[in-house]
UniProtKB/Swiss-Prot annotation:
One Gene Ontology term of the molecular function aspect: UDP-N-acetylglucosamine diphosphorylase activity
Catalytic activity from the UniProt record: a monosaccharide 1-phosphate + UTP + H(+) = a UDP-monosaccharide + diphosphate
Classification lineage: Eukaryota, Viridiplantae, Streptophyta, Embryophyta, Tracheophyta
Cofactor(s), names only, from the UniProt record: Mg(2+); Mn(2+)
EC numbers, comma separated: 2.7.7.64
Matching InterPro entries: Nucleotide-diphossugar_trans, UDP-sugar_pyrophosphorylase, UDPGP_fam
Name this protein carries in UniProt: UDP-sugar pyrophosphorylase 1
Record GO biological process: UDP-N-acetylglucosamine biosynthetic process
Family: Belongs to the USP family.
Tissue: Expressed in root tips, young leaves, flowers and developing embryos.
Keyword Repeat: no
pH dependence remark: Optimum pH is 7.5-9.0.
Length: 600
């Protein structure tokens, strides 16, 4: 049984011996080949078993399940099996919202009240290297007018929901979980601690670290060893689908359920608009009693974003899931839609675009995870050396995605979606300047440049809908990307959590010129008959009520271009292609409670 280990086998603990037997039974003899006798390399051997134990304990069902799943998926991949065989696609049911109308406001207000029964899970990505930024992505400023980083924006948004949903009763702390990795864990903790958790109680935030999975060297799912170290298995990330198993094994879901929570909201790391969409989507979940609600945006046919689709199998099974755009078109063509993925009379595809933000009903979620242990349907994507598909160019591994959770749900599960306009809900930052500049004209750049400009656009459009005269945008080019430049308007989440709140704080005849910057940093700032042509920064503590009126006219902050190759500029500016030259501004700070009037 353990012959390749020789006398080393007798030195192992009973648990380690069981692990070895299982590995040998599953075709992993090569792991112990050429091991020297006891007394040689013992420290390395112990480290190897520590790693094996870690890999075994962090995967639902252990390494045996991982190897079994890998053999099946690798065989399917080699045979070219299509995971959608037997499924017919159709348009699922969901709710489409138009910002600011009666229906939208109804859901938004309902969602704010529901938020006291919610927990948030931030599936934090890795480092910002792909963006040309050396820090963690959560530390990246969402916009450079106030330099608010993504995680600060998220936490302040959750705290704003926490306060608004309490309605005068004692505040219920809304918990936040952040999934980290080896690369990001320490830096995420440091970012939170050095900023006093951006206003949250440290006990409100839980960091769960994701482990990697073993790499596979061939179609027999033999675990790959490091080329330079026969006592170490190669590992790679398993994907953000791990979040479900981590939440389940941590026991935190049960704690939430016993505390009376009802919703778990999953979101990703660099979408500066996301929380504008969350209250209304949560309101939809509550009204429709959805077990799963995917936030979505209108999507053009064949656009490079997954489509939310109902799949019905010939055996009667059905599910509502995200189908990647490159799979959706051929699937439709093979199912009696000769033109594949085409726009309908709305000008958009009937299959809405998945933006990877999920709202799950907690009780149903726990029930499902107790059956699966949090395991999510996986896939494998080996890079084969040639058409024979017998060997790989480099080792591969199994992967899983958070949004594939509904694949294991029974047909009785209520799975729906909420579509919101892209300008309001979706501006991810995931492409660096060079890659974004190569994006075909008309397609979204998804860069730091477009992400920041999208925040100003959304805030400008919202204020317009609230009755403010906001100047029309102009198109400018930064880092080779044509973007709409609107007035640089920002506010704290506590000021503008919902459309109703914003409307209640803006009155009379207000106007903002194109070259203006307006930063509202306080919840109780009221704007009445205000004209801004320049830069105005108002900072006030929670208990300071400030009424602002009159005419602000100064030289303002001038937008200047920055070359992404200019090493004399900081990374956060280079990746955007612009910076602000702060020539002149009216800046006021109210640090005491009371009522104040700023007449410009």
């Amino acid at each position: 049984m353990a012959s390749s280990l020789g006398d080393n086998f007798n030195l192992l603990s009973p648990q380690q011996q069981e692990l070895v037997k299982m590995l040998l039974d599953n075709g992993q003899e090569h792991l112990f080949r050429d091991w020297p006798a006891p007394g040689v390399d013992d420290d390395h051997k112990n480290a190897f078993f520590d790693q094996l134990t870690r890999l075994d304990s962090s995967y639902p069902g252990g390494l045996e399940a991982y190897i079994t799943n890998a053999k099946r998926l690798l065989a399917d991949s080699k045979a070219g099996r299509n995971p959608f065989d037997g499924f017919t696609p159709s348009v699922p049911t969901g709710e489409t919202l138009a910002f600011g109308d009666e229906n939208y406001i109804k859901f938004e207000e309902a969602g704010v009240l529901e938020a006291r029964k919610a927990a948030f899970v931030l599936v934090a990505g890795g480092l910002g290297e792909r963006l040309g930024y050396s820090g963690i992505k959560l530390a990246l400023p969402a916009e450079t007018t106030t330099r608010t980083c993504f995680v600060q924006n998220y936490i302040e948004s959750i705290l704003a929901l926490q306060e608004a949903s309490s309605q005068g009763e004692s505040q219920t702390q809304i918990p936040l979980v952040i999934m980290t990795s080896d690369d990001t864990h320490g830096r995420t903790l440091e970012l939170l601690e050095s900023n006093s958790y951006f206003g949250m109680q440290p006990t409100q935030v839980t960091l769960l670290k994701q482990e990697k999975v073993a790499c596979l060297e061939d179609n027999d799912a033999r675990l790959a060893l490091e080329p330079q170290n026969k006592y170490k298995i190669q590992t790679k990330p398993h994907g953000h689908g791990d979040v479900h198993a981590l939440l389940y094994s941590s026991g935190i879901l049960k704690v939430w359920y016993e505390a009376g929570l009802k919703w778990v909201l999953f979101f990703q790391d660099t979408n500066g608009l996301l929380f504008k969409a969350i209250p209304s989507a949560l309101g939809v979940s509550a009204a429709k009693q959805y077990h799963v609600n995917s936030l979505a945006v209108p999507r053009k046919a064949k656009e490079a974003i997954g489509g939310i689709t109902r799949l019905t199998h010939s055996d009667g099974r059905s599910m509502v899931i995200n189908v990647e755009y490159n799979q959706l078109d051929p699937l439709l063509r093979a199912s009696g839609y000769p033109d594949g993925d085409v726009n309908c009379e709305t000008g958009y595809s009937p299959f809405p675009g998945n933006i990877n933000q999920l709202i799950l009903e907690l009780g149903h979620y726990i029930e499902e995870l107790s059956k699966t242990g949090g395991a999510i349907q996986e896939f494998v994507n080996p890079k084969y050396k040639d058409a024979s598909k017998t060997s790989f160019k480099s080792s591969t591994r199994l992967e899983c995605m958070m949004q594939d959770y509904p694949k294991t749900l029974p047909p009785s599960a209520r799975v729906g979606f909420t579509v919101m306009e892209t300008w309001l809900a979706y501006a991810p930052v995931k492409n660096n300047a060079e890659d974004a500049a190569k994006v075909p004209k008309g397609n979204p750049y998804h860069s730091a440049t477009s992400g920041e400009m999208a925040i100003y656009r959304a805030n400008s459009i919202i204020l317009r809908k609230a009755g403010v005269q906001v100047a029309d945008p102009v198109v400018q080019v930064f880092n080779g990307q044509e973007v709409e430049v609107w007035p640089r308007i920002t506010w704290k989440p506590k000021w503008g959590l919902t459309f109703n709140r914003i409307k209640s704080k803006v009155s009379g005849n207000c106007s903002i010129s194109l070259r203006s910057t307006l930063a509202i940093k306080g919840p109780n700032i009221f704007i009445e008959n205000l004209s801004v042509d320049g830069a105005l920064i108002i900072d006030a503590v929670d208990d300071a009520e400030v009424n602002v009126s009159g005419s602000v006219q100064n030289n303002g902050w001038v937008l200047e271009t920055v070359d992404y190759k200019d090493a004399s500029e900081p990374e956060v500016l280079r990746i955007r292609g612009f910076k602000f030259n702060k020539i002149e501004q009216l800046e006021t700070k109210y640090s005491e409670p009371g009522k104040f009037h700023l007449k410009a």
